[in-house]
Amino acid sequence: MPTMRGGLRLRRRPLRLRLPLRLRGAELYAIEAEDHYLRLHTSRGQDLILMRLGDAVGELEGLEGAQAHRSWWVARRAIADVRRGDGRAVLTLKDGTEVPVSRTYSRQLRAAGWY
């Protein structure tokens, strides 16, 4: 989405162009918010970029995924396992990363057939 600065319209670089070169073309597993940064979990490793989670999720059209927590977005095909216990769920990704599922998003994921 364009932003205004000094009367000029500036376009932000899309998420795919913000990725470090070594991660371009990698399968995106998850996005984790860390303060003002996002940690991208991919098939080629992880890296941080400066971007808001909501903006990044808005640019993921065509990739099936969902928020699992206020600070996590997960690609459905990246999930290797789901554990549930004590009223909580944890998603384990292909790379071994464990993603907490909040109660708020748990209902939505269950309704969508994720577990």
Where are these regions (language model features)?
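Conserved binding/recognition cores within well-folded domains
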Residues: 2-94, 98
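Short, charged, intrinsically disordered terminal tails
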Residues: 110-111
